[in-house]
Amino acid sequence: MLEIFDVNHTLLSETKSGELFTLRKETFKDRLNWAVQCTDGMEFDQYDNNNTTYLFGIKDNTVICSLRFIETKYPNMITGTFFPYFKEINIPEGNYLESSRFFVDKSRAKDILGNEYPISSMLFLSMINYSKDKGYDGIYTIVSHPMLTILKRSGWGIRVVEQGLSEKEERVYLVFLPVDDENQEALARRINRSGTFMSNELKQWPLRVPAAIAQA
């Protein structure tokens, strides 16, 4: 059974936090060479706190993918770490989430789920499902140009709000991710083009997909 679900930072076990922060170090420091702080082989920062909720994709008790949500009324990476990258950032008041630290461990995904399973798109859809379930109005995030391309290809009707430059002089984008019924249906339909999944299963929260179906 592949499961994607939410866990608040206050409820995160020491074992799972260690696994998560180790995978984040391997992704953001070792592979992407981002300017992140690492301690004892793990990557975590001041935004990993009691205001944080994580989405986990787990199969056989193994973390495959994850991301971090913080309500925009709290300190977050858009208004903190990434703020100097942009000439102007204006996040509207409202019931919005900030998303960061999105990753998929490609080697784990391949070994456990196979090559045909659309895990990135599944995590995108889970962001919508979670937001709708909890009553949020949308998601803001900062992405690189390659990640922007992946988001556009997913079928999600995203909107670029601002463009900036990172510390490495690379383009980065402040993006709004809508969480309405139309975008939920668009992502679910694209994921299920082969008819592998039950359509109603894809729109549930938490998201649970039987392993036999996931590997079909």
UniProtKB/Swiss-Prot annotation:
This is Acyl-homoserine-lactone synthase. Its EC number is 2.3.1.184. The keyword Acetylation does not apply. Belongs to the autoinducer synthase family. Required for the synthesis of OHHL (N-(3-oxohexanoyl)-L-homoserine lactone), an autoinducer molecule which binds to CarR and thus acts in the control of the biosynthesis of carbapenem antibiotics. Pfam families: Autoind_synth. The keyword Transferase applies. GO terms for molecular function: N-acyl homoserine lactone synthase activity. Keywords: Antibiotic biosynthesis, Autoinducer synthesis, Quorum sensing, S-adenosyl-L-methionine, Transferase. It catalyses: a fatty acyl-[ACP] + S-adenosyl-L-methionine = an N-acyl-L-homoserine lactone + S-methyl-5'-thioadenosine + holo-[ACP] + H(+). One of its GO terms (biological process) is signal transduction.
